[in-house]
Amino acid sequence: MNLPRFFEDLSRACSGVVLLLSTAVLSAAEPSLPKVSLHTEPNASLRNEVRQAIAKGLGWLEKSQNTNGFWSTADYPAITALGLAAFEMQPANREHKTTPPAVQRGYAYLLSCVQSNGGIYRKELPSYNTSVSLTALVLANRPEYQPAILKARKFIMGLQTDLNEPGRIDSPFDGGIGYGMQDKNPDLSNTSLALEALYLSKQYVKDHHLEEAGDLNWQAAIHFLQCCQNLPASNAEPWASNDPQNKGGFIYAPGRSMAGETNLPSGRVALRSYGSMSYAGLLSYIYADLKRDDPRVVAVMDWLRGNFTLEENPGMGPQGLFYYYHTLAKALTLYGTETVETSAGRNVKWREDLALKLINLQRADGSWANENGRWFEKDPALVTAYALIALDMIYGKI
């Protein structure tokens, strides 16, 4: 398989990207690792430290895997898929492809979750679990997974929202994808996961000369994305705002921001843009083949530069912090920038700063976890996979 071109751009050391959810409780606090100075100059030593951190994190995943092949819970195959992605993307696979027993068990469990409709899930969150699992199957690059890949693609494409008149884009929700349950509207988080899986698997299908019918309505997907962006020039929704704090950033879904709302001097109420969804929006635009000079891409990059920080998830504080790190690493890598110029005029070498941040946050046993439990980030299996994927992408270019 010739990996998609952007896989190489990720870091020259990894072979994919991914996201997800989990359900577990953080274990008792553990002793901290020796801290790395945030003022250390980037060099071969830092690169070695990143590789060591990755190896230690993967070791923790191997030891913490359930004997049935899943991580954290059997109810959500997406959790296991994220762990598998971390293994597939590790730097060692650049030199010699390895398939340790934990990976073999993980894929066996994943395939046990394949449903007759092509989805990869147990009982809940069919879109969420299928999207992340599809990405992991593509990363494995094994011919025996091709039938599951094709069926999962068809399943995800069938979940794209089309409200009101069929075939006509006449709702802000048209084109998006939600959790895959009838009572759930589409949201940017699930849509970005689905677009990622479909983009990667489309390249896989092309590389292997496989036959399939149909494709996602990408124009409708772009419509949904811009309906989640604070940019009145391309979003006619009444909440979209040009105010300096929010212009260009993204929210969770049309009319809904996890970061709440703010009263503007004009008397209008704006929905607050926030960090993790803004990086998810940038990623999704890239998957949808929007170019760097597209006004929608320019606007979100302006917001991200103005709100760049590794101390919090902008607009959300510590909530979803590792999801933020993971999405930031993917988005800035695919966008193709070595530095981020902040609103203060500082050019940040984001890879080096993020690598040091993650090394400092790694626990003594090799895992990571967030002290804030929102979105299940007290689960070390989830957060360790987030951190490892970010480090995998960073490794090749520091």
Identify the residue ranges that each predicted region occupies.
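Generic short amphipathic/hydrophobic targeting helices enriched at N-termini
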Residues: A13-C14, L21, S32
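An alpha-helical repeat/solenoid feature that recognizes helix-turn-helix modules
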Residues: E30-K56, F70-A102, S116-K154, G158-L356, ...
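A non-catalytic alpha/beta surface segment that caps or lines the substrate-entry region
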Residues: Q65-N66, V114-Q115
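Bacterial N-terminal signal peptides that target proteins for export
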Residues: N2-V17
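Short amphipathic alpha-helical/adjacent loop interface patches that line ligand
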Residues: L10, C14, L58, Y107, ...
